[in-house]
A protein has these predicted regions:
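A glycine-rich helix->loop->beta "capping" turn
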Residues: 54-57, 77-90, 96
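Conserved residues in the N-terminal Rossmann fold of short-chain dehydrogenase/reductase
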Residues: 36, 61-62
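Short, conserved SAM-binding/catalytic segment
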Residues: 47-55
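Canonical Rossmann dinucleotide-binding motif of NAD(H)/NADP(H)-dependent dehydrogenases/reductases
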Residues: 3-35
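Conserved mid-core segment of classical short-chain dehydrogenase/reductases
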Residues: 67, 72, 95-101
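The beta1-alpha1 cofactor-binding region of Rossmann-like NAD(H)/NADP(H)-dependent oxidoreductases
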Residues: 41-45, 62-76
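Conserved glycine-rich Rossmann-like NAD(P)H-binding loop of the short-chain dehydrogenase/reductase
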Residues: 30-46
Length: 101
C-alpha cells in the first residue's frame, strides 16, 4: 500500500527536538523524505538516525533560520539530496534578548 506522502520532500525547521521532532517522524512514517534542521548537530542527527532506522530517508541541515544564507542552503539540501521540495514546516522559533512589552 502506498503511503500518503510517498516520495514527497519535507523541510522542517527546529526538528531536532520537541514538536519539530514529532512532525519529522510523522511525515517520514507517511513516506516523506525529510530534511531535518536544528541549531545543534547531535539532536538533528538523532532524528535522521531514527527515521532511517524505521526505513525512511532523511538528512540534516544544521543552522539558524535567522542566518542570511540559511534559506538557500536549506532548500538547496532538499533539491540536491531528494531532487525537489513539496512541504515546508516552519517550526523553529527565536526570542529577542530583551523583554517584549
Amino acid at each position: 500500500m502506498t503511503k500518503k506522502l510517498e516520495g514527497k520532500v519535507a523541510l522542517i525547521t527546529g526538528s531536532g527536538r520537541g514538536i519539530g521532532r514529532s512532525i519529522a517522524l510523522k511525515l517520514a512514517s507517511e513516506g516523506a523524505h525529510v530534511v531535518v534542521n536544528d541549531l545543534d548537530e547531535a539532536p538533528a542527527q538523532e532524528v535522521v538516525a531514527a527515521i532511517r532506522a524505521a526505513g525512511g530517508q532523511a538528512v540534516a541541515c544544521i543552522g539558524s533560520v535567522t542566518a542570511p544564507d540559511f534559506a538557500e542552503r536549506f532548500i538547496g539540501t532538499a533539491v540536491s539530496e531528494f531532487k525537489g521540495l513539496d512541504i515546508i514546516v516552519n517550526n523553529a522559533g527565536y526570542t529577542w534578548d530583551n523583554v517584549v512589552q
